[in-house]
Amino acid sequence: YGISPAATRVSGDERWLAEASTADAGPGMSAGGAASTPGRAAIGQQTDIYRFDITSPGPPRFVAGGRVPGYLIDQYALSEWHGYLRVATTTGTSWALADGPPADAQTSSSAVYALSTRGPVMRLAGHVTGLGRTERIYSVRFMGPVGYVVTFRQTDPLYTVDLSDPAQPRVRGSLALTGYSAYLHPASDTRLIGIGRQAD
């Protein structure tokens, strides 16, 4: 398929590949209602997601595709749960990814999307946007129906996103700390460990 994935994730008998894209949303690849940024010059303003079946010997079999706005930080920004793929992305050029303050730094923000995995096109079921305005995602972890998203610029807001209803995700709470967590690890169903750096 000639894909250079920004993130890859294996879930059971399936593999997910996410590739940063600047192309206009084409037929059969739209996230089904999620805002996109066609014609955008910045790298990674959209992410194409491909689902492959890896149960049989030989090459993986393409199953479905979808698209969401923004870019993924790593494989933990993807998670399948009960027929839905949860994806955490940042849109806008982050202040931390350019030399000096970018012109659109004030518009950068993050979001979590829930895509239905039924059918050849992954359609948008629901989303929550506006996380960490002027910031970018530093770490993500999904644990069952809950997603944890860390964004950072001067403080580290840890957002708790309730995804129990994929059609209506909502922010359940947030915790602001100095510094940021670059890695989140589930210690139990009720405990999350964050590893990162302290900020002055």
Model-identified regions with their sequence ranges:
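Beta-sheet-rich non-transmembrane sensory/scaffold domains
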Residues: 1-200
